[in-house]
Amino acid sequence: MSAQVEQLEFQAEARQLLDLMVHSVYSNKDAFLRELISNASDALDKLRLEAFRNKDLDPRTVDTSDLHIEIEVDKNTRILTVRDNGIGMTRAEVVDLIGTLAKSGTAKLRQKLHAAKNLKDTAASEGLIGQFGIGFYSSFMVANKVELLTRKAGETAATRWSSDGEATYTIESVDEAPQGTSVTLHLKPEDFEDELHDYTSEWKIRELVKKYSDFIAWPIRMEVERRAPATSDGEGADGEEQVTIETQTINSMKALWTKSKDEVSEDEYKEFYKHIAHAWDDPLEVIAMKAEGTFEYQALLFIPSHAPFDLFNSDAKIGMQLYVKRVFIMSDCDQLMPMYLRFVKGVVDAEDMSLNVSREILQQNRQINAIRRRLTKKVLSAIKDLQAERPQDYRTFWTQFGKVLKEGLMSDSDNRDTLLHISSFASTHSDEEPTTLAQYVERMKDGQDQIFYATGESRQQVMNSPHLEAFKAKGYEVLLLTDPVDEVWVGMAPEFDGKPLKSVARGEVDLESEEEKTAHEAERKEQEQNFAGLVNWLKETLSDHVKEVRLSTRLTESPACLITDAFGITPALARIYRASGQDVPFGKRILELNPNHPLITGLQQAHENGGDDTHLRQLSETAELLYGTALLAEGGALENPAKFAGLLADLLSRSM
């Protein structure tokens, strides 16, 4: 006997999201069956793992003797049921499942879905559904009503959930139900134009299982009709066929990672990737490997073609599954791949490891650490091959995952050289095409022994920075690094191919040849003499802001710029450290002056001429404005915008 039925409303945002997903997102409605089978497979994996780890499970309430997935159809009522006898769910977990839709029903997801729809980007929109983990609701594409009945293994109470996909759903406790979960779909009528097929048809079910779920490790069973002609012993009179019902397993259950690459079709790899990654895009690269010797294991890895929405979330998971002798152990096994390769999806099947292994044990496991090192090198090698042999695919990869891969330049010193080789960067060499460091080195000017780079928030900001002026004038290529991670890794990767990496905004800049230095030596000494008074006065006047004032060799157009010591912390890097909770003291920088700029020569003349108190005050205000404009020119933020605006207004008023 069931308890009272509780009827609840979907949140308004959840209704909008469900409606958008069902009617606008999926281009292929057949995919609903893959989602349901994938969920059932996960439930069976979890129960088998629990049985390995907990030997005290009560056999009266937990049955692991015949774990399987069952598909049942009723042609007359047009009902399709997908059933498993896996781990099942409690009422609280069912409510949380409903909450998944509500929690995923955010403005962010809806905006992305709308954008993908408007751009007619089917792969992107379907990918979002897999990423947000709400594929269960794809059932409403083909069904007018969906019912879920579930009982947690080891529990006695069951739960029934039901909805028509509109405004409400119902949930109730049920006294009796088999272990596991069944999802029952009351199918919509067939509609050829809307691509609604007959999902009660045996051949259609077989087709979809073969296409999407043939590799599932659990048997997928279905009752099928077998017809035989009438026999001569009188049975089947009047020429009627004999109809028998038999249960058949309709999937092969062969683990793809145990096969050699030439035994697996491209489509099989694609569907397996979509299954384990809960993704809708095709993989960009498939990596199959088998290791023998001290540590034996097989691995099947995939590099996606699209970045997941949560790639940069602090709680982003590593999409690696661990098996031991074909037995599922855990998903999201973060010990199998470094965090900077968290976009890689795949399976590792080890031969010599305890089935009772836990995440805590894995952290100290020598075999896992060795596997991790080998997998890392294999993935990086595959990316290197993409770069050399399939440049367009590499470009796609770098666009999607370049930012996260560069995290490895900070954290993985063992593979830093490889990472530097497979990384690409924007540069002043081309507005469109990124460059590798090896290509940069090939183009270096005669006598150049450093790789120059500039950091900032955008290409436009960096290109307009005064720090680049001398480099542009003399034709030196500069890398344009605009990702936040760039500020950090450049300090940890000091050189490439024996060439030091040099910031255009740090320390001294020396771009002149020996001949040029000799020719300009007299002029430089004269300038230092002429501007000595101004330099000393500015250092004193701006002592709250700068530690030093000097003439610049990097400026050709701007009057001044701010630079950091060769080993100092840039303001952008300081902001990153502070955002992560580190206490970084304010560091004064160096103000460089362009001795050939009219503003600087005019300021020098005004300082040399002297004057009354009003004149000196106005001169000091001009110095403050000079500092502020240098800060703004590099994309920095003013310490006191109101004060700067007031000084600027006064100056403009005097010039009227």
Swiss-Prot record:
InterPro entries: HATPase_C_sf (IPR036890), Heat_shock_protein_90_CS (IPR019805), HSP90_C (IPR037196), Hsp90_fam (IPR001404), Hsp90_N (IPR020575), Ribosomal_Su5_D2-typ_SF (IPR020568). Keywords: ATP-binding, Chaperone, Cytoplasm, Nucleotide-binding, Stress response. PROSITE patterns: HSP90. CDD domains: HATPase_Hsp90-like. Residues 1-359 are annotated as: A. Residues 360-575 are annotated as: B. The keyword ATP-binding applies. It holds the Pfam family HSP90. Its main location: cytoplasm. Residues 576-656 are annotated as: C. GO terms for molecular function: ATP binding; ATP hydrolysis activity; ATP-dependent protein folding chaperone; unfolded protein binding. GO terms for cellular component: cytoplasm. It is found in: Cytoplasm. Transmembrane segments: none annotated. Molecular chaperone. Has ATPase activity. PANTHER family: HEAT SHOCK PROTEIN 90 FAMILY MEMBER. Belongs to the heat shock protein 90 family. Homodimer. This is Chaperone protein HtpG. The gene is htpG.
